[in-house]
Amino acid sequence: MAPPTVLVTGGAGYIGSHTVLEMLNAGYNVICVDNLCNAYSSGAKLPEALSRVQEITGKKVNFYRVDITDREQVRSVFQEHKIDMVAHFAALKAVGESCRIPLQYYHNNMTGTNVLLEAMADNNVFKFVYSSSATVYGEPKFLPVTEEHPTGNCTSPYGKTKYFTEEILKDLCKSDKRWAVVSLRYFNPVGAHISGRIGEDPNGEPNNLMPYIAQVAVGRRPSLSVYGSDFPTHDGTGVRDYIHIVDLAEGHVKALDKLRNIAETGFFAYNLGTGVGYSVLDMVKAFEKASGKKVNYTLVDRRSGDVATCYADATLADKKLGWKAERGIDKMCEDTWRWQSQNPNGYANK
C-alpha cells in the first residue's frame, strides 16, 4: 500500500518544519503550504527550513506558497494532489500581539481553518490533526492539567482562537461521522533538531522565551526582558511545561499513525508536555550551563494574558498514542544552543 500523503499547513514554520522532517523519516509523503509570514525565505522556490529538511532526510518536500484564508489557493492544492490527511499548524501565535490585533488573529486562525475544513470535505478528506494549545485551559484550576480540565476560560484572543476552533471541530465530528480529528494541546515547544540545521528563527523580535534567551547568548540582543517577577512561584517568574520540539514532532507522527490505522472517528484531544514545570529563571540558568554564556536579563511588568503556572498531565497521550516526552531541560538547551551558535542570524546566514 502506498504511504499516505499528508498536507501540512504552516510547514515552513518552527513546529511545522520539525514535524515534516519526522513525518518524512516515518515514511509519509508530505505536501507543505505556508504563507511565509513567520518563516524565512530567500525568495528561492523552497523556504530555507524545508530545503534543509530535504538535505537532512534525502526526501522531497512539495511546497506551495499559499495563504489558507484564500479559498482558491487552498482548493488548487487539493485539486493537484490526492491528499489523505491534513496536519494543520498555520496560525498566528503570539499571546501579547493577539491582545493588540484580535481581528487579525480571528481571521487568520479561524477563517483559515474553516476554509481548510471546507476544502477537505469537498475532496473527501476527513482525517485531521490540529495544532492546539494549552492556552485553551486558561488559568489552571488544578495541576497538572489533564484533558478533563475545563476549556474556554482563555486569557487571550490567541487562546480563544484555539478553543473556538476545537469547538468547531467537535461540532463537525458530531454532524458528520466520517471525521476523525486529533487535537494536540501543546505546552511550550523549545529546542531544535540535533543536527543544528533547523531550529526556531522567528521574524523580528521573538515572542517566545527560548529564542530570545538564545539570541541574547549569541550576542544578537543585549538582554532578556523577564515579564513578571511577582507570580506565586518559587522565584516569582512564570512556570511553564517546556517540551522538546522533536518530542512534539514525534507526537504528531503518532497522531497520524493513529488516524491511519483505526476506523474510529470523532474528536480526540491529547496534551503534549513533559509534566514538569520550569520557571523563566530556571530556563535562563539551564541555558547558561549549556552554552557557557552569560544571559543578561531585566525584570519587567507582567504581560496581559500570562498565567502564573501551567504544566501538563500527558499520561493520556502515552496510553492512547504510545507517546511520551523523552528529552529533558538540558537537552532542550543544548540543542537550542547548537542551532543558534551554528546559525547566529538564523536561516539568513547560510
From Swiss-Prot:
Name the top EC class: isomerase
Q: Which InterPro entries match?
A: NAD(P)-bd_dom, NAD(P)-bd_dom_sf, UDP_G4E
- Pathway(s) it belongs to: Carbohydrate metabolism; galactose metabolism
Keywords of this entry: Carbohydrate metabolism, Galactose metabolism, Isomerase, NAD
Residue positions annotated to bind substrate are 133-135, 186-188, 207-209, 225-227, 240, 303-306
Picking any one GO biological process from the record gives: galactose catabolic process via UDP-galactose, Leloir pathway
Q: What EC numbers are recorded for this enzyme?
A: 5.1.3.2, 5.1.3.7
Could you state a single Gene Ontology molecular function term?
A: UDP-glucose 4-epimerase activity
Q: Which residues participate directly in catalysis?
A: Y158
SUBUNIT field: Homodimer.
Task of the protein: Catalyzes two distinct but analogous reactions: the reversible epimerization of UDP-glucose to UDP-galactose and the reversible epimerization of UDP-N-acetylglucosamine to UDP-N-acetylgalactosamine. The reaction with UDP-Gal plays a critical role in the Leloir pathway of galactose catabolism in which galactose is converted to the glycolytic intermediate glucose 6-phosphate. It contributes to the catabolism of dietary galactose and enables the endogenous biosynthesis of both UDP-Gal and UDP-GalNAc when exogenous sources are limited.
What is the official name of this protein in its record? UDP-glucose 4-epimerase
Native source organism of the sequence = Drosophila melanogaster
Source gene?
A: Gale
